[in-house]
Amino acid sequence: YAYPIVENFNPKLILDVGANLGATSMFFAINYPKARIFSFEPTQMNFRWLQKNTEGFKNIIRIKKGAYFKDTNAKIFLDSENGGRNSIYKDWTNSDKYELVELINLGKFLESKNLVKKIDILKIDTEGCEIDILSSIEQHLKNIQVIYLEYHGKNNEEVIMEILSESHVVKQKKAVAQK
């Protein structure tokens, strides 16, 4: 996972929400070695891989929780082909198999750690929870320098663009998917 590197930018705090196996966290750790990186991943198997893949990086803080708009436990349906497509929305996966996971209000988490005014990069890839997560931090968006967000669906795109355009210049990069 490669994201554009911002020139003359030395982030101190990065949030990787939906860290999956840790590829993006490692990308950030390599390119921004002075940054603290909080990596959120709620499912057991993905979290084990996240731990294993990132064990050599001292600046990655792994959190076995998912971000959401409230604190709750929820079913995450486990895609049988790709753990990166696990979702709380059953119809987004190809499986009835699920895992009960802990979800936390991201805004409250950031406030409790006194991090709301210090976020340099926020990356979100959460298979359908993007709007819920943005709503939990909406009042803090203006304090985030760079946001990388993967969203799914035209309806989500419109809502996300509306939320983000109030505080950020939005640049879209269209993904091409192929089976």
Segments predicted by a language model, with ranges:
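Phosphate/nucleotide-binding beta-alpha loop and adjacent structural elements of enzyme active sites
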Residues: 1-179
